Amino acid sequence: MLKHIIDVLADPIDGTALIGNDDFTQLISESGHAYDVAPAGYVTLAGDNGLRYSGDDLSMITARETFLSHGHFAPFVEAVSTTIEDLFDDIGLPDDAQPVITEVGAGTGYYLSHVLDSVAGARGIGIDVSTHAAELLAVCHPRVGAVVADVWSR
């Protein structure tokens, strides 16, 4: 949900903070730039030039989701989750902290949602350039906010 991560999002044009309008159908920057929240729950944060790439198409996303649902990468995602848990323990992160975990190229949110399941209170930002991926990303976990953006541009 974007409401859970709005405090860490910024306008890609000028870096000012974003806030949601009353019904959270738009995110608006302090400087007045507005970004529509898609009905599926993600927001596209692109600068004046828009996005250079469209990312994976629906068939690619569907194939990836089918593959991942069979558990082929389960050992890997478990190792990533354990590593992040251990890292937070090593740095002494308080139990009541709400760390933000960001995954760039998050796709459908498979990895991010598993990590959030293992870190109580953590919030997730999933970023992908594909709107098809963002539709699944937006609903992969209640503490994930989905953003369509090109991380190589501001």
Which sequence ranges carry the predicted segments?
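Class I SAM-dependent methyltransferase Rossmann-like catalytic core
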Residues: Y53-A79, T83, L87
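Conserved SAM-binding loop
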Residues: L137-A138
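Conserved class I S-adenosyl-L-methionine
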Residues: D96-G107
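N-terminal auxiliary segments of SAM/dcSAM-dependent transferases
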Residues: M1-G55
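Conserved SAM-binding strand-loop segment of SAM-dependent methyltransferases
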Residues: P142-S153
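Conserved SAM-binding loop of SAM-dependent methyltransferases across substrates and taxa
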Residues: T108-A120
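Conserved SAM/SAH-binding beta-strand->alpha-helix loop
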Residues: D128-H132
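Short beta-strand element of Class I
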Residues: A122-I125
